[in-house]
Regions:
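N-terminal export/targeting leaders of redox proteins
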Residues: 1-28, 109
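Short, surface-exposed, polar/charged, turn-prone segments marking secondary-structure boundaries
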Residues: 22, 70-72, 85-86
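Short N-terminal segments immediately surrounding and downstream of signal-peptide cleavage
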Residues: 25-42
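Short coil/turn and helix-start
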Residues: 27, 68, 94-95
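The canonical Cys-X-X-Cys-His
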Residues: 38-47, 101, 105
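Axial heme c-ligation environment in periplasmic c-type cytochrome domains
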Residues: 52-62, 76-109
Length: 109
């Protein structure tokens, strides 16, 4: 039990560290959703999985089973996540970057 708790806390800390660094983009510059995903999300969601809660992966079937079907749903979950997920506010990930990440998730997983 203690090992599980320590592992979860460690993973959450890694996610928080990953969230601390974000890319600046110039006006009109296309945002690379894959790059942003790798920078902010891949630590906890490698290959679309979920190291904290394996039942909540980014795979289409799991997303839809959890009511996440659109770009808007993904961004909403990034901004106001459930237990175990780091909150990505607008200061951490801009709306444009969040949209690029969400589009990448829908297209890739």
């Amino acid at each position: 039990m203690k090992k599980s708790l320590i592992a979860t806390v460690t993973l959450l800390a890694l996610c928080a560290l990953a969230a601390g660094s974000f890319a600046e983009t110039k006006k009109g510059e296309k945002i690379d959703g894959a790059k942003e995903f790798k920078e902010h999300c891949a630590v906890c969601h490698p290959d679309g999985g979920n190291v904290v809660n394996p039942k909540k992966t980014l795979k289409k079937a799991d997303r839809e089973a959890n009511g996440i079907k659109s770009t808007k749903d993904i961004i909403k979950n990034m901004r106001n996540p459930g237990p175990g997920m780091t909150k990505f506010d607008k200061k951490t990930i801009s709306d444009k970057d969040a949209k690029a990440i969400a589009e990448y998730v829908l297209k890739t997983f």
